[in-house]
């Protein structure tokens, strides 16, 4: 089995986690108490969904997940929510005091106290796996817990489970919408850790998600529930190939192999189609070609950056539902002829496709329409550097005046860490620039060598 353990850190991680597990349960027909009426064989360990759920002797399905927060309110919502019976009580770990939007508190003072307990729980989950494939980490980079404790956990996971892949789903700060003044600090510090300790990071930002909700679903004032359900659809599409058997299945490690050309360049842009309300879907024929076109629309991106300003290095298309390879090939061929979608010149083909025959599921009473087929795109594009440089710029403005720095230093952090993290991100911006640069001048140099021999 290729089990995956999900780790949900801080408010953002836990709330997106709730939406994801709600959707997984609906997709697999698992009830909120963990029972699965359709599954007659108790202890049948070969079912594909066992990558995400473990089955107890009593036939109860328990998510392979850990919820961690440094303060209890969000965890208590899980403990009292609809799915309270789904989780093992030990899988939900909460501290007493908050990280207060401070990376240093999440990483050094308060996070330190809880991290061993969390790793112990993760170890228990890992021991239950026959072939652990990796970790999915859900967090926000702008808060205190998601950034600080998130980085600390990733560092420790690298030590304990070096070879296992770690994918992170990070809610990154948006250009206009901010929940904290110190977001740029937390974000730069945690991105510094993500660079080193994750194999692949999927960037999502709230502003882009708000826009998608407003534009495509006509929700005037989207709530976090609306956003999280959207995120859950994306994550469900990415993980569908692990949880169902399909025609062209894509493994977690396969993502990395196909999307990450250089270890540092692993920040992904995602989009999903069709994002459409029930009233509209009734009147539209959403063919494979149409949904494939719409995932490349800049307006549908889940991160605020414009892919037309960058070049694609690699692109994964995960289809689900009523889709056949022939249609996919035709749709991709059409995309390739479009001049708007530019690939770097050293990566001519650049598309990886996966098909899963399980149709997309929607939450009853949710915003999305039930459709026959859907596609999720994950792209590695140089345009994501836009989002990085935006955060860096905000960081520079505050750091030049050393504003708010005393809160971090007071929690036992050294000022040097700020500049170290910032330099690392400056190097990353440079890396993206070089990757997207034309390689034409390189050809001239090779010819010179030819004359020497």
Swiss-Prot record:
<feature type="binding site">
    <location>
        <position position="179"/>
    </location>
    <ligand>
        <name>GTP</name>
    </ligand>
</feature>
<dbReference type="InterPro" id="IPR008280">
    <property type="entry name" value="Tub_FtsZ_C"/>
</dbReference>
<feature type="binding site">
    <location>
        <position position="11"/>
    </location>
    <ligand>
        <name>GTP</name>
    </ligand>
</feature>
<dbReference type="InterPro" id="IPR018316">
    <property type="entry name" value="Tubulin/FtsZ_2-layer-sand-dom"/>
</dbReference>
<dbReference type="Pfam" id="PF00091">
    <property type="entry name" value="Tubulin"/>
</dbReference>
<dbReference type="InterPro" id="IPR017975">
    <property type="entry name" value="Tubulin_CS"/>
</dbReference>
<dbReference type="GO" id="GO:0005525">
    <property type="term" value="F:GTP binding"/>
</dbReference>
<dbReference type="GO" id="GO:0005737">
    <property type="term" value="C:cytoplasm"/>
</dbReference>
<dbReference type="GO" id="GO:0005874">
    <property type="term" value="C:microtubule"/>
</dbReference>
<feature type="modified residue" description="N6-acetyllysine">
    <location>
        <position position="40"/>
    </location>
</feature>
<feature type="binding site">
    <location>
        <position position="144"/>
    </location>
    <ligand>
        <name>GTP</name>
    </ligand>
</feature>
<protein>
    <recommendedName>
        <fullName>Tubulin alpha-2 chain</fullName>
        <ecNumber>3.6.5.-</ecNumber>
    </recommendedName>
</protein>
<dbReference type="InterPro" id="IPR037103">
    <property type="entry name" value="Tubulin/FtsZ-like_C"/>
</dbReference>
<comment type="function">
    <text>Tubulin is the major constituent of microtubules, a cylinder consisting of laterally associated linear protofilaments composed of alpha- and beta-tubulin heterodimers. Microtubules grow by the addition of GTP-tubulin dimers to the microtubule end, where a stabilizing cap forms. Below the cap, tubulin dimers are in GDP-bound state, owing to GTPase activity of alpha-tubulin.</text>
</comment>
<comment type="similarity">
    <text>Belongs to the tubulin family.</text>
</comment>
<dbReference type="GO" id="GO:0005200">
    <property type="term" value="F:structural constituent of cytoskeleton"/>
</dbReference>
<keyword id="KW-0460">Magnesium</keyword>
<feature type="site" description="Involved in polymerization">
    <location>
        <position position="453"/>
    </location>
</feature>
<comment type="subunit">
    <text>Dimer of alpha and beta chains. A typical microtubule is a hollow water-filled tube with an outer diameter of 25 nm and an inner diameter of 15 nM. Alpha-beta heterodimers associate head-to-tail to form protofilaments running lengthwise along the microtubule wall with the beta-tubulin subunit facing the microtubule plus end conferring a structural polarity. Microtubules usually have 13 protofilaments but different protofilament numbers can be found in some organisms and specialized cells.</text>
</comment>
<keyword id="KW-0547">Nucleotide-binding</keyword>
<feature type="binding site">
    <location>
        <position position="206"/>
    </location>
    <ligand>
        <name>GTP</name>
    </ligand>
</feature>
<keyword id="KW-0963">Cytoplasm</keyword>
<dbReference type="InterPro" id="IPR036525">
    <property type="entry name" value="Tubulin/FtsZ_GTPase_sf"/>
</dbReference>
<feature type="binding site">
    <location>
        <position position="71"/>
    </location>
    <ligand>
        <name>GTP</name>
    </ligand>
</feature>
<feature type="active site">
    <location>
        <position position="254"/>
    </location>
</feature>
<dbReference type="InterPro" id="IPR003008">
    <property type="entry name" value="Tubulin_FtsZ_GTPase"/>
</dbReference>
<dbReference type="Pfam" id="PF03953">
    <property type="entry name" value="Tubulin_C"/>
</dbReference>
<keyword id="KW-0342">GTP-binding</keyword>
<feature type="binding site">
    <location>
        <position position="145"/>
    </location>
    <ligand>
        <name>GTP</name>
    </ligand>
</feature>
<feature type="binding site">
    <location>
        <position position="228"/>
    </location>
    <ligand>
        <name>GTP</name>
    </ligand>
</feature>
<keyword id="KW-0479">Metal-binding</keyword>
<keyword id="KW-0206">Cytoskeleton</keyword>
<dbReference type="GO" id="GO:0046872">
    <property type="term" value="F:metal ion binding"/>
</dbReference>
<feature type="binding site">
    <location>
        <position position="71"/>
    </location>
    <ligand>
        <name>Mg(2+)</name>
    </ligand>
</feature>
<feature type="region of interest" description="Disordered">
    <location>
        <begin position="432"/>
        <end position="453"/>
    </location>
</feature>
<keyword id="KW-0378">Hydrolase</keyword>
<dbReference type="GO" id="GO:0016787">
    <property type="term" value="F:hydrolase activity"/>
</dbReference>
<keyword id="KW-0007">Acetylation</keyword>
<dbReference type="GO" id="GO:0007017">
    <property type="term" value="P:microtubule-based process"/>
</dbReference>
<keyword id="KW-0493">Microtubule</keyword>
<dbReference type="InterPro" id="IPR000217">
    <property type="entry name" value="Tubulin"/>
</dbReference>
<dbReference type="InterPro" id="IPR023123">
    <property type="entry name" value="Tubulin_C"/>
</dbReference>
């Amino acid at each position: 089995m290729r089990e995956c353990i999900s780790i949900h850190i801080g408010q953002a991680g836990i709330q997106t986690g709730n939406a994801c597990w709600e959707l997984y349960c609906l997709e697999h027909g698992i009830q909120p108490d963990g029972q699965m009426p359709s599954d007659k064989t108790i202890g049948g360990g070969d079912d594909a969904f066992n990558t995400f759920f473990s089955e107890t002797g009593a036939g109860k399905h328990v998510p392979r997940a850990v919820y961690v927060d440094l303060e209890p309110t969000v965890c208590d919502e899980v403990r009292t929510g609809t799915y309270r019976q789904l989780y093992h009580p030990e899988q939900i770990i909460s501290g007493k005091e908050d990280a207060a939007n401070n990376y240093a508190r999440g990483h050094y003072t308060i996070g330190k106290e809880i991290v061993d307990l969390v790793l112990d729980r993760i170890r228990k989950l890992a021991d239950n796996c026959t072939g652990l494939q990796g970790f999915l980490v859900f967090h926000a980079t702008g808060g205190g817990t998601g950034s600080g404790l998130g980085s600390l956990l990733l560092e420790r996971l690298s030590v304990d489970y070096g070879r296992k892949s770690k994918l992170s789903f990070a809610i990154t700060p948006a250009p206009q919408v901010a929940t904290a003044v110190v977001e740029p600090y937390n974000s730069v510090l945690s991105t510094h850790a993500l660079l080193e300790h994750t194999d692949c990071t999927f960037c999502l930002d709230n502003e882009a998600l708000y826009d998608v909700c407003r534009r495509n679903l006509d929700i005037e004032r989207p709530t976090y529930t609306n956003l999280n359900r959207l995120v859950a659809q994306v994550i469900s599409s990415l993980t569908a190939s692990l949880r169902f058997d399909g025609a062209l299945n894509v493994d977690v490690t396969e993502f990395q192999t196909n999307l990450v050309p250089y270890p540092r360049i692993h920040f992904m842009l995602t989009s999903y189609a069709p994002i459409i309300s029930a009233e509209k879907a009734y009147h539209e024929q959403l063919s494979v070609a149409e949904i494939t076109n719409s995932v490349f629309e800049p307006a549908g991106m889940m991160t605020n950056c414009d892919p037309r300003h960058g070049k694609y290095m690699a692109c994964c298309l995960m289809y689900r539902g009523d889709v056949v390879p022939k249609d996919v090939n035709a749709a991709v061929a059409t995309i390739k002829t479009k001049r708007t979608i530019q690939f770097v010149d050293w990566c001519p083909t650049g598309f990886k496709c996966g098909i899963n025959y399980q149709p997309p599921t929607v939450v009853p009473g949710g915003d999305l329409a039930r459709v026959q087929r859907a596609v999720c795109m994950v792209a590695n594009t140089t345009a994501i550097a836009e989002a990085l440089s935006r955060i860096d710029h905000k960081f520079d403005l505050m750091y030049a005046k050393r504003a708010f720095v005393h809160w971090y230093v007071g929690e036992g952090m050294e000022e040097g860490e700020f500049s170290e993290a910032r330099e690392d991100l400056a190097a990353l911006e440079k890396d993206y620039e070089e990757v997207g640069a034309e390689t034409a001048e390189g050809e001239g140099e090779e010819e010179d060598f030819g004359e020497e021999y």
